[in-house]
Amino acid sequence: MSGDGGHSPGDDRPTRGSTYVVGDIQGCFESLQALLAEVGFGDADRLWCVGDLVNRGPDSLAVLRFARNLGDRFACVLGNHDLHFLAMVYGGHPHRATDTMESLLAAPDCLELAEWLRCLPLLIEDRNRLVVHAGIPHVWTIGMAREYAREVEAVIQGPGHAEFFRGMYGNEPALWRDDLEGMDRYRATVNYFTRMRLVDAEGRLEFSHKGTLDDLPPGYAPWFSYPMQVAGTLYFGHWAALNGATGQARIIGLDTGCVWGRTMTAVRLEDGATFSVAAAEPSP
């Protein structure tokens, strides 16, 4: 169902094509195809994603193959599940009970897809638009976010990526400091970009709360509730329990819980039209 007040897919679209930003896909390939049909996705259109292309849903392999085949018509930031897949491939991390990537890991093009995936950024900037997976903390300026993203991207895409993925996991340091170095600095950066939901006034991360905005732990609030040092419109995913609701006109949540049996949502950048389809896959 289109969520843009009855605006028909394709009406008033630029002749050079439109750009659609979609929420967390997480291996829900059938839902993605249904959403693209709903928006009338054409050969001149572009697809952006807020990350988490893989895991929890049934067909991560098809999602990665489809995204890669779009070439320069596709853009995406890395999400925590994407990084988990890369940590399994390059860092030797074990399969978790909740993972659903067996067919992807066994595919003949698994390494080729992993090589493509690890070239994706942590932050996309396009004029006055930003795309991240989890968010940008209020203690960073956009210049800081850009700098820290590029630092980690260089490591992930460089010869030391295996060492990075072996040391990526962990909740510490939970508070950003400018003097952080090495793996501590990279881990904190990744956690802000891909795992953040709640922070305190100083920017300290809280990792346990994954639910709604009810019953928040004392001293913590959603990252987007603090005065931001970032201008423009920011698109993010990761926090399915929000169902897209932030109460902020310029901070757009796009994870509407498709992998949990709810909906998959996309926004057309040119006019802000919102589109959603019901999940086609059974919830795990």
Language model feature labels by segment:
Residues 61-64, 68-184:
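Active-site neighborhood of divalent metal-dependent phosphoester bond hydrolases
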Residues 5-15, 40, 67-69, 121-125, ...:
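A short acidic-Thr-Gly-centered motif at the start of a beta-strand
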Residues 1-70, 83:
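N-terminal active-site segment of His-dependent metallophosphoesterases
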Residues 26-30, 55-58, 81-87, 138-139, ...:
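Active-site environment of divalent metal-dependent phosphoester hydrolases
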Residues 22-23, 47-51, 76-79, 234-237, ...:
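Active-site neighborhood of phospho(di)ester-bond hydrolases with catalytic His/Asp-centered motifs
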Residues 146-284:
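Acidic, His/Gly-rich catalytic cores of divalent-metal-dependent hydrolytic chemistry
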Residues 19-26, 129-135, 253-254:
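Active-site-proximal beta-strand elements of phosphoester/diester hydrolases
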Residues 24, 52, 67, 79-80, ...:
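Divalent metal-coordination and catalytic microenvironments
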